Amino acid sequence: MAFDATREREESARPAGAHPAGTGVRRAYFDDGQKAKYGPEQQQRASGMKKILIGLLGVAAVGWTAAAASAATLDDVKAKGFLQCGVNAAGLAGFSAPNDKGEWTGLDVDYCRAVAAAIFGDGSKVKFTPLNAKDRFTALQSGEVDILSRNTTWTISRDTALGLNFAGVTYYDGQGFMVNAKKLPGVNSALQLSGAAICVQSGTTTELNLADYFKANKMEYSPVVFETQQEADAAYDSGRCDAYTTDQSGLYSIRLKLTTPDDHMVLPEIISKEPLGPSVRQGDDKWFDIAKWTYYALLNAEELGITQANVEDMKNSENPEIKRVLGSEADAKIGTDLGLTNDWVVNIVKAVGNYGEIFERNVGSGSPLKIARGINALWTKGGLQYGQPIR
């Protein structure tokens, strides 16, 4: 398959990675003039004391900063009366997109509603901030949003250099390719895309994975890079690119919005691991606990058969594990240990259902996407989704 090598290349400058503000550390030191009055032994002792003081002051400064942050987010969220959640500005059907009434819907959106329900007992106490890929981490680091739930891949650099804590993997995904089957009828594999112009969004893991894949397979390609997903979508739909690459779930979502969706085919290859999940700022352990245990609560509820329809009845169950999860034990305190009420899981499930219900409603059999559970099934059904025990 031959591709037009003269196709225009549009490339935006890669946005510099934002880094969280550093913690200022006071340094203790001795001036050189005073140190000169001592002999070698005294100088060595003074130098050792200097290092100890520096270390103690550094630990104290970092400890004070972490302690100050530890109570901040939950208290701030409660004080303002709502959760601020960062979602996809482009509107990714099934994950985060406004419906016909302007209400945000999707798997990522329902996770935020679950967190709001855990805190307030009301899943509607959440506001959504639409964010592009290049803005999402800065918005979280700066405190513009309390939590980021925006089809974001969990990587080591984001977990460390960007100062994020990922609460879990709400959707196991992988990067794929989509082509116009009518325009390229002979292409049924990504290995046939040598020389192709490929639409890709900047500031994403997708861009790097694309380069790695073509290099590994000794193929040439022309990246057509756009700053926003909206621009990439429009360029591909207009025919400016031979193929489009992003997370495979995203391709199914984007295809629904194309002028002629049925003309386009998602190729079978998955070229990367894309564990997608919500994240919070580092330095606030209590908030991190709430973020990750909300995710685990959704999974445990599905595993135990607790649904949006039966959760009230399940509160009367004699099953010890169900009683513990729903906070109906006489000495229940798991919720209060999190800074929440003991019926926090009841509130979550009443608001959004369990993980399986969220999946099917937004991206599964009950949605236009019709994506199979696959590896996103529970571990008891051959999948990777596994809720840590609530006990």
Predicted regions and their residues:
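C-terminal functional modules
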Residues: 331-391
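Acidic, polar ligand-binding/catalytic clefts
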Residues: 113, 117, 121, 125-192, ...
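Extracytoplasmic small-molecule ligand-binding "clamshell" domains
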Residues: 71, 78-149, 333, 340, ...
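Extended ligand-binding regions for polar small-molecule ligands
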Residues: 110-113, 117-119, 181-184, 191, ...
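Sec/Tat signal peptide C-region and signal peptidase I cleavage site
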Residues: 64-71
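Bacterial N-terminal signal peptides
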Residues: 55-64
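Bilobed "Venus flytrap"/periplasmic-binding protein-like clamshell domains
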Residues: 84-94, 104-119, 173-231
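Short, Lys/Arg-enriched N-terminal segments with co-localized hydrophobic residues
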Residues: 26-48
